[in-house]
């Protein structure tokens, strides 16, 4: 298994979502590398667990500014906000990737 794989970023909420192409690019590159490891090198990869489906407090920095999830949470570094959740672009990209069993990385 490839586990706890993700990227933290200071996401910006705009147009009622987060346009996180940098997260999509990161995930695409990692998934392609896993596919290559299986197809070219014969590695018996059983699964991939992306780390941080929902934004959470950063373990290293103790703040919300650096976000890891594919779902935005309206909260600041002090726990203030509506706690409303909104799917980021990466959520929809990963949904499509999963539905295709990793074949659609566009």
Identify the function of each model-found stretch.
Residues 1-106:
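Non-catalytic scaffold segments within catalytic domains of secreted glycoside hydrolases
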């Amino acid at each position: 298994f490839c586990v706890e794989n993700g990227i933290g970023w200071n996401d910006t909420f705009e147009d009622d979502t987060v346009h996180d192409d940098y997260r999509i690019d990161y995930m695409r590159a990692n998934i392609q590398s896993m596919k290559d490891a299986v197809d070219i090198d014969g590695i018996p990869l059983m699964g991939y667990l992306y780390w941080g489906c929902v934004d959470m407090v950063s373990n290293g920095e103790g703040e919300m500014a650096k976000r890891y999830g594919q779902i935005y949470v309206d909260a600041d570094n002090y726990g203030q906000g509506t706690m409303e959740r909104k799917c980021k672009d990466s959520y929809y990209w990963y949904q499509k990737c999963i539905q295709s069993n990793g074949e659609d990385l566009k």
